[in-house]
Amino acid sequence: MIGALARKLFGSANDRRVKGYQTRVAAINALEPEVAALSDEALRARTAEFRAELAAGKTLDDLLVPAFATVREAAKRTLGQRHFDVQLIGGMVLHEGDIAEMKTGEGKTLVATLAVYLNALAGKGVHVVTVNDYLAKRDSGWMGQIYGFLGMTTGVIVHGLDDAQRQAAYACDITYGTNNEYGFDYLRDNMKYRLEDMVQRGHNFAIVDEVDSILIDEARTPLIISGPLDDRSDFYNTIDTFIPRLDKSDYDVDEKQRTVTLTEAGMEKIETLLRDAGQLRGESLYDVENVSVVHHVNQALRAHALFQRDKDYIVRNDEVVIIDEFTGRMMQGRRYSEGLHQALEAKEHVTVQPENQTLASITFQNYFRMYDKLAGMTGTASTEADEFFDIYKLEVVEIPTNLPIARLDEDDEVYRTQQEKYAAILAEVERANKRMQPVLVGTASIEKSEVLAEYLKKNGYKQIDFTDPKGMDKLYAAARAGKPAKLFAVLNARFHEQEAYIVAEAGVPGAITIATNMAGRGTDIKLGGSLEMRIQQEAAHITDEAERAAKITEIKADIERFRDIVLKAEDEIEIEPAKGNKPAKTAKRPGGLYIIGSERHESRRIDNQLRGRSGRQGDPGRSKFFLSLEDDLMRIFGSDKLDTMLTRLGLKEGEAIIHPWINKALEKAQQKVEARNFDIRKNLLKFDDVQNDQRKVIFDQRIELMKEDSVAETVTDMRHTYIEDLVAKYVPEHAYAEQWDVAGLKAEVERVVGLDIPVDEWAKEEGIADEELITRLERVFDEHMAAKVGQWGSDVMRYAEKSILLQTLDHLWREHLVMLDHLRQVIGLRGYGQRDPLQEYKSEAFNLFQEMSSHLREAVTAQLMRVEIIPPDQPQELPPMEVHKMDPDTGQDEMALANVTLAPAQTTDKADRDPNKPETWGKVGRNEDCPCGSGKKYKHCHGRYA
């Protein structure tokens, strides 16, 4: 109460911050006449003037007022749009590295140009991040007119570009692109072997559009570049046949936690099935040797019990394609990891693709935290303000709307069953359609959108494609005649290519649009329809200028007439029935776009995004949610109590309960889910930070190595450290000479580097110490390497050293990632032993990293000591074996040796191999037993150094 009173007297922190910008807004407005008087050339010249002032010592903050005034004038001259005062405030928030929360239709795209231009003056590059390729191309072309007018270059990063095109785009002053493309380019850059092949040029400043969608909704989804492992499709198909043979009592499903576990009875049944199929080793499913089998069984269970077709994924062209739960879009090319995607493929009887090994990965949380300055824009961020500040140190600033919001948000209607709910939605859609009010029905999944579509079809409605001119002509003709055409369109992941057109036309009189979650759609719904879309469809093909101008005038008049129809499509509802002579009391509901929500989402933000599609820029509109006790959120969070209450109230079939209390109860349930999801994301980030710290060390190390003309000093240091570790292993510190394992040391040296060094003779010398052994070994190793340099030349050896070092580092890093993944899966069990899983993970991950570093020194030393290089002009008995690293974008061989070829592998008969002389082994298959007699596979023994 006291807090509310204080806010009334002094305003909220947000109000005070917004008020603090007014001085600079006034200064920008005061400059407007002066800037407007400049010629185009003089206005363009201001960019060079600003850059000169920066070079002379001024800061970007010093230039904010004149730079913003310049952009505002350039926008007026190129786009015919002038930044409102509130948009100037939004630009200041972005420049300060925070989140500008701006309602739908307030011009976020235009706002970004202010901060983008100002920060691009520094010449370090500015990245504007969008959620899809369409928006990246649209915004770069649209806003690029402003930047181009002011003498700045604009690039765009979309799927399908080669490295040269990407380099050119990143070299521009301003680069537009999707979050996925930026992240994958970063990962690919850190798999390159030459600095000149890298495409990004640092992470200076990024503005993220739909920041909540990217940094919250997708925060738990890592970007992964992977390579195929051995084919195990038969095993997945075998395991999949067992799951339908289980009863529901054989496993427990926790929908809140998204987990499924076998009961005792289920475990016994699975063990019997596995044993009969010859897939179980030992007696128990949980024996150590069955760890992989347990993993596959768990993933198959999850695929059947937790994942639903047409909700979590769709099946198309013999593929399982993931559906983004927040946007309803197909995530083409994305695959679930850890074998889950293969389990889904087996479940749906499509081709099971090989499992992949992670080659490189990063989460959006860690990628975007690399930027020196990060900012974001969205229509809905305040509900997640704590998370934005906690994880990204971004404050959310609510920007006032240019005009007051005139949308009416009504209380939810709650029904007993989904069938009753759908019937009520259908009735509401019919009422709105009769008065020509456009309706947008939001659904939580593709499945639900298609259920609603079937309801409409059964009641005489016809589905059309809003991108089809014939279908739209019918809708326009009906709108002109003022008669409902009973036509509807469906927007979901199946038709995502057309989503911008479908959304843009959702404001036409009588239009009915069914859409999955509207998060991140990025396209305004204008009352009466979209002028740009109609010109593109109806006038773009007209070549005659006069004819084209006439057509555009006709379209404009059409849209104005349609807008007027929509604004007048008010609804009069009875709020009190007639009593005696007293007439019924009625109330008017506004026209405009009518938003109908068919289900509450787990996140209030997604619901707010749906509501926010209506009421743009002061337009009237209304929104209402229709719910049932069978909806996921209601079912999982307390529908039993509500059901009992509705029964006591005597609620009949088809009747709904409408009360603000219901809305508050649902909001509390949503807050609980949001808090739980935040905790999950926060906890996952703590674990991912461990891997991220190691990733930064490896990636920074790679870049430093690529910068060096020669890594000779680095490999020499590695060689010497390896020798120190080797001697310490066989010659314990402060031990007597009699306790030294000289034979072991000699054998290890011979095994790893192939040199017969008289270590045993040295050890017999009087008074020799371990330091002397180290010195002598270093001298022998160094002389051996010097001989190779003398034989093949310094340039050739320097190239070989760098190639081998980078390749080996990459190989071991990939193996390390697999180890970290496995560790992360099981580390939670340490909690049962009263130990903190996070601290245990940090400790174990550090030990693994140290181990990897040790293996790197050993492997690089071994390979360089053994490498034989053959100049191309020397005759060869066998075809050469070359080292290749194919770039995934261009297909270029990044590891092509310009004038050098590694020596061919010789094939030797197994009978002629001497276990103690690796030089007699020739080529050994990776899965053969190692010729040394260890009993291990070659790839796990000497093959590690091959």
UniProtKB/Swiss-Prot annotation:
Gene3D superfamilies per UniProt: 3.10.450.50, Helical scaffold and wing domains of SecA, P-loop containing nucleotide triphosphate hydrolases, SecA, preprotein cross-linking domain
Region (Disordered): 904-933
Signal peptide residue numbers: none
InterPro entries, per the entry: Helicase_ATP-bd, P-loop_NTPase, SEC_C_motif, SecA, SecA_CS, SecA_DEAD, SecA_motor_DEAD, SecA_preprotein_X-link_dom
Entry's EC annotation: 7.4.2.8
GO biological process: intracellular protein transmembrane transport; protein import; protein targeting; protein transport by the Sec complex
Keywords: ATP-binding, Cell inner membrane, Cell membrane, Cytoplasm, Membrane, Metal-binding, Nucleotide-binding, Protein transport, Translocase, Translocation, Transport, Zinc
Catalyzed reactions per annotation: ATP + H2O + cellular proteinSide 1 = ADP + phosphate + cellular proteinSide 2
Family listed: Belongs to the SecA family.
Protein name: Protein translocase subunit SecA
Organism: Rhodopseudomonas palustris (strain TIE-1)
Record lineage: Bacteria, Pseudomonadati, Pseudomonadota, Alphaproteobacteria, Hyphomicrobiales
